[in-house]
Amino acid sequence: MRAQDGRYSILELSDQGRRAGVIDVHRSLGVLADDPEGFVAAIADPAHRILTLTVSEVGYCRSARTGTLDVERDDVRSDIADPTHPRSTIGLIARGLAVRAASGAPITVLSCDNLQSNGRATRAVLTEFLHASAASGDVLNFVDNHVTFPNSMVDRIVPGTTAQTVADVAGLMHVDDRCPVPAEDFTMWVLEDHFAAGRPAWDRAGAIMSDEVEAYELVKLRLLNGSHSLIAYLGLLDGHPTIADAWAQGFVRDAVRTCIANEYLPSITLPRGFDVDVYVDSLSHRWANSALGHRTS
């Protein structure tokens, strides 16, 4: 991305065809392992108002057994012993906030990972770390009163980048993009509108600002993820290599729709104003998208 001045392309895949567009929002880039001090300084900089996280579940340093801070991890133990030279993601964020506390400038830490109640989980594990590493009362008060952790939910199928992705972008845009991102043409981003120092007008681009993020999460987990697994299991057993191939089978569609109606929907409370019929119809289109090449195995 450095060689491309922070630019990359999104390749949207659908059965109606492929289209590509350029994302040009990054103004500086860094590799955390190469420059942890730069990361800490960026968090501490009062000019920066939102820290977004896409670090995968392992980046939160949570125990798979308890959901709390995993103090058995080597990097976490090291950071607790010496919080001024952190190695873990949570340790680095904690250090950045500790330095920022001197200015008192509010900031939002926005998790965008597939983690239930991700904002609440991030706050909890970070607070645990601060206490374990003997953070000062000033730092603890700053995090309590001037740092917010909104819950959010992201829903978009993003396959891995392949040589075909690069070739498709080159054919559509006549550029040699070394880091394109393929994705389906469906997007849903739901966020709590709880930002400590303002936010961009993401809602104008389609983001849903809601105090019911957890309800949206359950819709995704049960209706999308649960059904997706059922399609994969039935499709694989019936000899179909992709989700789209499996969804084309009548018995698979019948089984999934029956589960949605009789098992999944009765187990959740829908968000206010949520049109479940429209959402289920969109799921059908997503599962039928053969351009994604999603495997059943």
Where in the sequence are the language-model features?
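Substrate/ligand-engaging "lid" and interaction regions
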Residues: 1-297
